[in-house]
């Protein structure tokens, strides 16, 4: 099933004031996904090869993507189950003909959405054009939707404990920050390894309509991690993350805080409530 909908540019990670202007919908929204395979439902718990191209208004496949250091390159493939219970985040290679291919294992059955976060190279500037394209998928098996759950300031996943210190009152279009400490199973500060050009990723989806934005947590030695973005996250010592965020809509949101600790990708889900 296809849902070829382009959304506005993501907020990325960069500097911001107490109130920011949200980015407009990108003109690149006329680009669309083509040739998505497989065309039908996919299995849960087994690797499946997905492939597609992004086609431009003139019918040619997009082949010019931003490259280099930092997270604002190529495409991010973010698969999210529609009840916001699970997420898979990948950064696949792109073939010279524009084909995007990746092997994905879906952890659970049900309705999923692929959000392709695109960083397209623009001529005459180093700033990529950023926009998103959506694709619906069905994963075979019995679907039992899970509630989003209450707001909690501490989550333990894979033995690592993520704790938010002083939850702010979140409001639409206000730049704000979450200060999060992360400890390993022994209670010591966790050490993150750069992953997809950032020290950690904060992926946000709104419950219901799946509105999206994505920011990055950057350490001082990560070149271009915070480039050309609306609000920055940062980390200056092990186990301490400062997450930048600005919400485009009120409602209930899920934050998937992701990072590489050792050789493992760890994802901590938090429920958040945003006021208008």
PLM regions: where:
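Sec-dependent N-terminal signal peptides
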Residues: 1-5
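C-terminal motif of bacterial Sec signal peptides marking the signal peptidase cleavage site
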Residues: 8-12
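N-terminal soluble domains immediately following signal/targeting peptides that reside
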Residues: 13-276
């Amino acid at each position: 099933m296809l849902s070829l909908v382009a959304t506005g540019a993501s907020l990325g990670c960069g500097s911001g004031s107490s109130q920011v202007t949200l980015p407009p919908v990108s003109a690149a929204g006329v680009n669309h996904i083509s040739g998505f395979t497989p065309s039908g439902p996919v299995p849960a718990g087994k690797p499946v090869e997905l492939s597609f191209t992004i086609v431009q208004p003139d019918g040619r496949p997009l082949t010019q993507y931003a490259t280099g250091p930092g997270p604002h390159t190529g495409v991010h493939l973010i698969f999210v189950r529609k009840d916001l219970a699970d997420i898979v985040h990948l950064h696949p290679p792109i073939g010279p003909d524009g084909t995007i291919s990746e092997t994905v294992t879906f952890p659970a059955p049900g309705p999923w959405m692929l959000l392709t976060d695109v960083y397209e190279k623009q001529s005459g500037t180093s700033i990529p054009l950023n926009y998103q394209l959506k694709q619906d998928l069905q994963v075979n098996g019995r679907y039992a939707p899970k509630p989003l759950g209450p707001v909690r300031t501490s989550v333990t996943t894979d033995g690592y404990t993520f704790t938010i210190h002083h939850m702010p009152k979140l409001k639409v279009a206000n730049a704000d920050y979450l200060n999060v400490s992360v400890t390993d199973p022994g209670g010591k500060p966790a050490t993150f390894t750069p992953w997809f050009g950032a020290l950690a990723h904060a992926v946000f989806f709104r419950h219901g309509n799946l509105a999206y934005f994505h920011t990055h947590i950057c350490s001082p030695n990560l070149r271009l991690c915070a480039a050309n973005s609306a609000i920055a996250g940062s980390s200056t010592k092990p186990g301490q993350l400062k997450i930048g965020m600005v919400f485009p809509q009120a409602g209930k949101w899920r934050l998937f805080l992701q990072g590489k600790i050792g050789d493992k990708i760890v994802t901590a889900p938090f429920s958040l409530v945003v006021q208008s």
